[in-house]
Amino acid sequence: MALTTGTKLGPYEIQSPLGAGGMGEVYRARDTRLDRDVAIKVLPGSFAGDTERLRRFEQEARAVAALNHPNILGVYDIGQHQGSPYMVCELLEGETLHEKIQLGPMPQRRALEYASQIVEGLAAAHDKGVVHRDLKPENVFVTKQGRAKILDFGLAKLAPLQTTGAAAGEVATMTSPAQTMPGMVLTWDGTMVAAA
């Protein structure tokens, strides 16, 4: 569902498109009640009848709304517009960690600062029983002020993760295929080892 400038979603007025991905279109909008700029993620109309995508979208909203941490994208509200669900988030200015990495090597101190902030955000999520399950440079945003923010909890698991084949008490993990090297296996503690 492409929204045009001036479209109203409750108290939110669309200003401009910011981007689109597999799970939705993102717009810059104005919250007319609180007089602030926000980002609105709208599930595309073509997916409105897809119950699995709707479930994942609502799961992401619930997972992120349960968290309140400076290194996790803030969610302010959810709603529906002409049958399409939307999520209202804080508006970020900067670039993804992936985009920063593409610019070339960064100073070690800065890389460690980002890593530390990401770990703090993940720890806060884990403390609330939320496991991200799709952490990659594309899902980390670095603001103009240098703060790393974890995005896209669309694959988040809200309860302790247990998969077929994982023994009781083991932590099952999931990583993006692009983050796993051929012949390598991700272990329970997140380290990669050669497959025997």
Report residues per predicted region:
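Conserved ATP-binding/catalytic core of the eukaryotic-like protein kinase fold
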Residues: 1-196
